[in-house]
Amino acid sequence: MGKRIISQNRGKGTPTYRAPSHRYKTDAKLLRFKDEVVAAKVIDIQHDSARNGPVALVKLPDGSETYILAVEGLGTGDVVYAGDNVEIASGNITYLKNIPEGTPVCNIEAQPGDGGKFIRASGTFGFVVSREADKVLVQMPSGKQKWFHPNCRAMIGVVAGGGRTDKPFVKAGKKYHKMKSKAAKWPRVRGVAMNAVDHPFGGGKHQHVGKPKTVSRNAPPGRKVGSIAARRTGVRR
């Protein structure tokens, strides 16, 4: 019997595959509001290893502090407003039903009150396309259009940190430090590059799979690699 392959080790769960969430600063939820408009002053813009975009540390009227996602153009000293009747300006938070068509939005709630689930990555934004009495249509960054409840809240603007992917890592060491903050094992070694004891595709005089790559859905752990229960393989013609 060979060694456990990576997918088996990941299932067991070890620090290698566990996100270092004790180093994460915040969930970066939307500011809560009821009947009154909440004004929050931006104290600082900070990096959070949990996400790609920066977060803004804001001070609430009661003196408490919390984090929100930072949008493009937001800086220290700015004031962010959250409420039912707020100005349609970058950084403000309100219900989708109040946002005009064509307005860029981010950090949209999946269900009213959950604090924001969609469009949170750096440089991303969606558009309000249209609205009906009981739902609002938003175009997502992927181009797909999705309906939301009109009482789902959203932040107006574009998530800061756009253009992050334009700059190459250049050195493997920089990529290493980035991946250390994620729940990911890196670098990712190909199965055919391993020894036979480490992977079903490993071993041999040269790098080749050496056996059918398709495998049964009922294959045992450790053999279940490749094209799992594939209906077809090869280039679709």
From Swiss-Prot:
One Pfam family, short name: Ribosomal_L2
Region Disordered, residue ranges: 1-20, 201-237
InterPro entries: NA-bd_OB-fold, Rib_uL2_dom2, Ribosomal_uL2, Ribosomal_uL2_arc_euk, Ribosomal_uL2_C, Ribosomal_uL2_CS, Ribosomal_uL2_dom3, Ribosomal_uL2_RNA-bd_dom
The keyword Signal is annotated on this UniProt entry: no
Keywords: Ribonucleoprotein, Ribosomal protein, RNA-binding, rRNA-binding
GO cellular component: cytosolic large ribosomal subunit
One of the protein's GO biological processes: cytoplasmic translation
Gene3D superfamilies in UniProt: 2.30.30.30, Nucleic acid-binding proteins, Ribosomal protein L2, domain 3
Biased composition (Polar residues): 1-11
Signal peptide residue numbers: none
Classification via PROSITE patterns: RIBOSOMAL_L2
Superkingdom of source: Archaea
Function: One of the primary rRNA binding proteins. Required for association of the 30S and 50S subunits to form the 70S ribosome, for tRNA binding and peptide bond formation. It has been suggested to have peptidyltransferase activity; this is somewhat controversial. Makes several contacts with the 16S rRNA in the 70S ribosome.
UniProt-recorded name of the protein: Large ribosomal subunit protein uL2
Protein encoded by which gene: rpl2
